[in-house]
């Protein structure tokens, strides 16, 4: 209910450098606890400027990622509440209207993330199969608000940084101008967040299932 309420009622729209929407209080206290406590491997990472380390890192980082799937859903009950919000017709209609994309027959992908010292993301575009990208932040370690996502214009000039505020988030549609990344910055302990996508490829969670 928290994510649904945030998308429907606690949302602000922006157009620079591309259309995006910021969310306030999208997570319940229980969901914050679940995201904070889920075990995410601290094995060495390549930190090649991609999340999966598929540009010179042999994809090693991708093998350490934690997605909400059927085989671990019983351990992540509050993540399942988010799935229900994301399947809600009011939510789907609201997101579709904003991003101007048809979500019919799409799937939901949810990832639990703990970015640690050395992590960064080069400016990139999402693959077209990602119809929408949403990031939800928790800042329980009082990290710098500058650790939010960086948005760029077509000249790769940094235009805006979404603040890394506790219990906040944003979303946007994939496109040919939605350049985003994370500059090399100091992460003192952890940058915990959750990435949510509506995608065209199959996952455990079809919106109609």
Question: What does each model-found stretch correspond to?
Answer:
Residues 71, 75-78, 84, 91-209:
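Catalytic core of non-heme Fe(II) oxygenases with the double-stranded beta-helix
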Residues 2-3, 8-98:
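Non-heme Fe(II)/2-oxoglutarate
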